[in-house]
Structure formats: C-alpha cells, structure tokens
C-alpha cells in the first residue's frame, strides 16, 4: 500500500539516534520516525526499506524487534562486503532472509521498453510450435537482443536507455557501476592482497583467449588455485561475476562431483563486459556501440 526509504548514506543523526534510543518503545520509535521523515505509512501492507544498511549496523540489528512487532515489512539493501564486515558489536538477526538480485534479463528489458506484449509472446509461440519466424522478424528480434546485450541489464543503464540517453551517456553510467565494483573489490583486497581485483580485471582477456578454463597463470605465473579460491568465491558470491564450475559426472547431486579448481569466470552482465573491454578509452562513442550491436558480441555467450 505504501513505502518509506531510509537511506543511511544520507539520513541525519536524529533518525539514527531514534534507532539507538527507542527500540524498547516502538510506539515512540514510529511516532518519531514519521515526524522526522514527514510521512506516515498508511495501509495494512507497507514496507520500510533500509538502503545502504551496512553504513548503520544498529538498524540491521533492530530488524529483530521490528519484524517481531509486525506492523510493517522490511527490506535491507547494501554492499555485500561491507554488510559482512560491519557486524562488530551487533547481533545479526535470524529474521534476515537473503535474496539474490540479478541484472534484468531480456524479457525484463523488453518490459522496460514497453515491448511486453509482442516480442516475447512471438518468440515463445515460435519455440513451442517449432515454427521459424522468417528472416525479417528474426533480424528485428536479434537486433533488439544485441541492443540488450550492449546496454546490459543493470537497472540504471536500462533506465538511461529508456530515457533516450545516448550510448556514450549509457556507457558513463556503466563505468560508474564498474567503479563501485572496484571499490568493493579493493575493500576485500585490503585483507587479501590484490587478488580479487586482478582476477576481475582479467575476465575479458580470459574470455577473449577462449580458454577451456580460467588460467591463473594469466593472473600470476606462480599462482596456485588454493591461494586464489577465496577471491574467486567472493567475486561469485558478490555476483560481480558468474563462476562456472566443471563437474566430472552429470549426476543430480552436482556438488559431489564439482572440480572447483577447473572453472571459468564470466562478467555478471554483458553490458558491463562491453564497457570493461573499452575501459582504456576515455569514453565509448556512438559508432562503436552501433558496430557492436551489428556483429561483435560473441565474447560473453
């Protein structure tokens, strides 16, 4: 019915003090919160969003009491590595359920550009009936798919595309996302040397060489898997990259047959891959993006 966002990167100290001072009296807590935010939640199904919750761990700890209170639903968002690290002196609430958030897929991208009623039903019908679309329709759909691949599925990038921004402006948005990724990787690397950052930077090169598996020798000629496995796991768990692990037998319990030392890494988003490849350029111009849409996107498939 309604929602409220508490962005702890921007909230003033009075809002934060309310969490510290009034958890034992939730009537007072909500009264103060609504007064400080200038808004009262109305309706039976309302949600309060704790954005950048890693910046204020006390709010995360308060979830235990707020959920038990039952008045509202709660969503927490934030940087995975900082959420993991900023837990000193707080009790991590068992009421938390982690939900993985993925980039928008092709169907969701089509929803965003108001094409939810044409392309996907056409593809689905052709697939179910095993009926070809014809060259003209196939070309039209593939152009839309290639556009999705270069824009990618990050909501900010898709929003920029839908808003009519140029490809150069969309590329700027994606460069900013990559910079945020690099900051998270750097935080990890402060305790683990420069392992995750180097691995992440080599993903496009690894894919371009079409190796059957990720070659750690391209990271460091003396590298051993056991010295880098935690960094690889972090990249995968943070969903900055997608880890594909070899299995020795195609059985139901794949985990029993996983050969974790034999793996490949892919970028988590094709649009970010395109921008990562072009990162040595100051910006990526319109003509280059249009050329990519036409014929040059095999690297992340």
Question: Which residues are covered by each model-predicted region?
Answer:
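Conserved nucleotide-binding/hydrolysis micro-motifs of P-loop NTPases
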Residues: 9-13, 80-84, 103-107, 248, ...
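Accessory nucleic acid-recognition modules appended to NTPase machines
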Residues: 159-301
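Conserved ATPase-coupling elements of RecA-like P-loop NTPase cores
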Residues: 16-19, 53-63, 86-87
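Interdomain motor-coupling "hinge/lid" segment immediately C-terminal to the ATP-binding subdomain
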Residues: 86-208
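Short glycine-rich substrate-engagement loop in P-loop NTPases that contacts/grips substrate
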Residues: 3-44
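Sensor-1/coupling segment of RecA-like P-loop NTPase cores
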Residues: 68-89
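Structural recognition of the conserved hydrophobic beta-strand(s) that form the central parallel beta-sheet
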Residues: 49-51, 73-79, 100, 109
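Conserved P-loop NTPase "ATPase switch" module shared by AAA+ and STAND
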Residues: 40-59
């Amino acid at each position: 019915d309604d929602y409220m966002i508490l962005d702890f990167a921007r909230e003033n100290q009075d809002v934060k003090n309310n969490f510290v001072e009034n958890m034992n009296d939730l009537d007072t807590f909500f009264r103060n919160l609504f007064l400080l935010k200038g808004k009262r939640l109305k309706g039976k199904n309302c949600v309060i969003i704790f954005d950048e919750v890693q910046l204020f761990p006390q709010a995360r700890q308060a979830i235990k009491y707020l959920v038990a209170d039952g008045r509202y639903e709660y969503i927490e968002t934030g940087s995975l590595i900082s959420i993991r690290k900023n837990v000193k002196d707080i009790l991590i609430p068992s009421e938390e359920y982690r939900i993985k958030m993925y980039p928008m897929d092709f169907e969701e991208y089509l929803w965003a550009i108001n094409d939810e009623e044409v392309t996907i039903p056409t593809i689905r019908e052709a697939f179910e009936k095993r009926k070809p679309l014809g060259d003209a329709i196939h070309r039209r759909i593939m152009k839309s798919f290639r556009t999705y691949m270069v824009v990618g599925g990050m909501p900010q990038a898709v929003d920029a595309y839908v808003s009519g921004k140029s490809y150069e402006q969309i590329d700027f948005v994606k460069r900013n996302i990559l910079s945020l990724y690099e900051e998270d990787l750097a935080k990890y690397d402060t305790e683990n040397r420069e392992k995750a950052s180097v691995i992440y930077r080599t993903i496009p090169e690894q894919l371009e060489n079409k190796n059957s598996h990720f070659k750690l020798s391209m990271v460091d000629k003396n590298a051993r898997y056991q010295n880098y496995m935690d960094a690889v796991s972090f990249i995968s768990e943070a969903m900055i990259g997608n880890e594909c692990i070899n299995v020795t037998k195609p059985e139901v319990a794949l985990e029993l047959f996983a050969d974790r030392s034999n793996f490949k890494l892919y970028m988590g988003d094709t649009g970010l891959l395109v921008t990562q490849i072009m990162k040595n350029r100051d910006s990526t111009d319109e003509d280059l993006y249009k050329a990519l849409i036409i014929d040059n996107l095999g690297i992340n498939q």
